């Protein structure tokens, strides 16, 4: 038996109208991984996800990058328990490679909410004798577990050149991020720097065994994310008003928690 053409045609019309009337559903907008790095609150790689204070700090293009005014730095790991994010700047000098210096610059917001951790030490190398950190600001340099400049110049292939060229040991300085933040390398008058993480237990360990990079220590904004995640939602924010929003499903966002919209 054949359906009369008119019935088929009206079915098609009804179907078309129904399909057009359906709201356009978007899939969950927050990716929870970038490669093998989990992305959780307060971070987000899709706009509207995570805490608004951390908006546009990460991008995920094959690898995860931390974006600052001085460039994108590859994220090595995020420790959500210790609230740290470790980045590595491939343009930075380390014990094994000497590269032209390149300031690490963060925005004011970044410096405020995720400054380098206390166990990240910056080593300013090959400083001129006129450097402020050897004169007026010499108290910014500290005793780094008894390590010396000569240890770096002598123990690292990359830094041996400082020793060779000057036939002596040019000064160096172990300091915290604030020194680098407030004075650019040009003002500091040191030709290179490197930074070392996890510095709490480096007494007696030579520079070949240090871990180079920058560890940022972030704080969680107090936006009521717990309530949202306990209700099964994902914390995000309204991209226009920047107000916190609880993302409940692909078709429903609540202001505070899923199940209630008040
Ligand atoms: C929910 O919020 C996200 C992030 O701001 C947004 O991308 C999405 O379009 C919103 N969905 C609805 C249904 O409003
Ligand atoms: C992400 O950051 C990296 C490093 O700065 C850059 O090369 C890449 O183009 C950025 N990707 C997007 C999608 O912005
Ligand atoms: C060390 O610093 C001096 C300036 O104080 C500079 O002329 C020299 O090129 C630097 N050495 C290297 C290997 O960059
Ligand atoms: C630096 O600290 C070490 C202990 O970590 C100590 O043995 C050494 O004497 C100190 N050096 C100076 C110059 O204060």
Predicted regions mapped to residue ranges:
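Extracellular/lumenal glycoprotein segments
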Residues: 2-262
């Amino acid at each position: 038996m054949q359906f009369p053409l008119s019935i088929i045609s009206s079915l098609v019309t009804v179907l078309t109208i129904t399909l057009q009337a359906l709201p356009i559903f978007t899939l969950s907008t927050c990716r929870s991984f970038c490669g093998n790095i989990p992305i959780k609150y307060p971070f987000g790689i899709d706009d509207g996800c995570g805490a608004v204070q951390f908006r546009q700090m990460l991008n995920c293009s094959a690898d995860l990058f931390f974006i600052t005014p001085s460039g994108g730095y590859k994220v090595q790991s995020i420790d959500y328990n210790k609230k740290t994010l470790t980045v590595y700047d491939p343009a930075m000098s380390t014990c094994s490679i000497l590269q032209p210096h390149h300031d690490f610059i963060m925005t004011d917001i970044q410096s405020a909410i995720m400054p380098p951790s206390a166990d990240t030490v910056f080593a300013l190398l090959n400083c001129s004798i006129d450097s402020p950190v050897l004169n007026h600001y010499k108290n910014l340099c500290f005793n780094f577990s008894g390590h010396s400049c000569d240890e770096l110049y002598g123990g690292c292939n990359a830094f041996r050149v400082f020793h060779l060229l000057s036939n002596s040991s040019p000064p160096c300085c172990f300091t915290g991020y604030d020194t680098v933040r407030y004075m650019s390398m040009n003002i500091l008058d040191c030709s290179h720097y490197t930074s070392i993480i996890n510095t709490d237990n480096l007494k007696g360990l030579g520079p070949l065994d240090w871990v180079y990079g920058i560890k940022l220590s972030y704080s969680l904004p107090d936006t009521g994310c717990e309530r949202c995640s306990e209700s099964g939602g994902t914390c995000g924010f309204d991209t226009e008003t920047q107000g916190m929003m609880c993302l409940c499903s692909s078709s429903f966002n609540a202001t505070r928690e899923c199940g209630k919209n008040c």
